[in-house]
Every structure is written in C-alpha cells, then in structure tokens.
C-alpha cells in the first residue's frame, strides 16, 4: 500500500510537503522482524523478496519531488533509520535512540543505508555506527549530522508540521528544482554541475511561480 501511496503523492501537485512519522509514540520504526528475517534466510529468498521490495519503496521516498520530513517520535532502528535517511530533513525526539543493529545478526543495512549513511555523516561515522551496532542518543545523532533538529518528544510531530507549513508557503516549482538539482549534481564534476544548474534555472524561469515571483 505504501508503494502505491507514494506513486499517488508523486503525481499529486496539490501535495506540497510530506511528513513521515510512526503510528503512536513508542517507535518511528524498529526495523524488520528478526524472526521474519530468519525465515527469509532459511528459504534463501531474503534479497529477492524483502530487500528488493523495501529498496524500491525507499527509493520512491527519496525521489519524491516534494520536500520530505521524517518525524522520529520513537525508537528508530535498522530499516527505520534507513527510511529516515531517504527524507530531506529529520527531526528527532530528545529521548529517542537510533541505531543500525544489523551487525548483531551477521548482516548490514541492506535497504540503502550502506550507501546513504556515509554520504550524510561521512565514512568514519558510518563505519562506527554499522560496526558497533550501538544505539545513539538524539544529541549524538545531531552532533554527527544524522538528524537536523532535536526537540522534546511530545513536540516532534508538531515541529515537523510547523516546518512543513513554512515550506508549503514557498514556490513549489522552485523547491522541486532545488531538490532535484542537489540530488543530480551530487556526483557531477563542478563544471558539469554548473552547466546542469544553468539549464535547470532556465526551465524554472518559464514557470508560473517564477513569473509571479519576478
């Protein structure tokens, strides 16, 4: 269902910002069910069935044209933090802990975390989090750049909505262009990235938002 919902959100121009949060207050997402993992391993189908599906969904979250905010309102482990990495911003409750515990069952973050985490916090911090598999505090997560903001647990969702409302007031075409541009130029040589950005802004200048803004 989430897979289909993401397709709908992508096509809906009336949706200007997306906030992801957990149901209830105990967890944003505690990751995969270890018993379920054991069954997949026994069948030899873990990669083809579970991780491919999960990676596809996470890629869709990352590729959403709208700005995205993860409101980490409870414990966030494994696949949960991998999902949060796909968002543009992460707001975390001060009592929440996050971690990548996969090493404890002879695995590693297989739903994109191995790729996305080093790009966000650097190789050394990523290795530390994945090697030791320890849960870290919200303050530590913010210190290393894993999350963008820490606030009291009971304010996480309201703060995320506040940020979303601020973004929703801005020109949506410009926000989409900035998001797409940053993602696309990340791996380009500087000069190629500059040329790309010139083309992007030329297209942006032809939009209704730009005509009204200028």
Question: Where are the predicted features?
Answer:
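A general structural signal for well-ordered alpha-helical segments in protein cores
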Residues: 34, 54, 114, 123-126, ...
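CoA-thioester-processing core
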Residues: 57-63, 71, 77-131, 143-144, ...
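A short acidic, glycine-rich active-site loop
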Residues: 39-52
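A structural preference for short, pocket-lining loop segments at secondary-structure junctions
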Residues: 1-42, 60-70, 89, 93-97
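C-terminal long alpha-helix characteristic of the crotonase
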Residues: 8, 91-96, 147-195, 199, ...
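Acidic, divalent-metal-coordinating active-site segment for phosphoryl/phosphodiester hydrolysis
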Residues: 134-140
């Amino acid at each position: 269902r989430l897979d289909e919902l993401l397709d709908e959100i992508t096509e809906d121009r009336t949706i200007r910002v997306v906030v992801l949060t957990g149901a209830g207050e105990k967890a944003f997402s505690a990751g995969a069910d270890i018993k379920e993992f054991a069954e997949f391993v026994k069948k030899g189908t873990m990669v083809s069935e579970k991780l491919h599906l999960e990676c596809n969904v996470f890629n869709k979250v990352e590729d959403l044209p709208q700005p995205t905010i993860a409101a980490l309102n409870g414990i966030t482990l494994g696949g949960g933090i991998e999902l949060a990495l796909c968002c543009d911003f992460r707001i975390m409750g001060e009592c929440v802990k996050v971690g990548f515990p996969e090493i404890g069952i002879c695995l590693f973050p297989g739903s994109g975390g191995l790729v996305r985490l080093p790009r966000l916090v650097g190789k050394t911090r990523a290795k530390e989090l994945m090697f030791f598999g320890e849960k870290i505090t919200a303050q530590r997560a913010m210190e290393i750049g894993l999350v963008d903001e820490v606030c009291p647990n009971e304010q996480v969702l309201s703060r995320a909505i506040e940020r979303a409302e601020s973004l929703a007031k801005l020109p949506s075409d410009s926000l989409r262009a900035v998001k797409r541009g940053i993602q696309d130029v990340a791996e380009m040589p500087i000069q190629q990235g500059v040329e790309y950005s010139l083309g992007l802004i030329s297209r942006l200048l032809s939009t209704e938002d730009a005509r009204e803004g200028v």
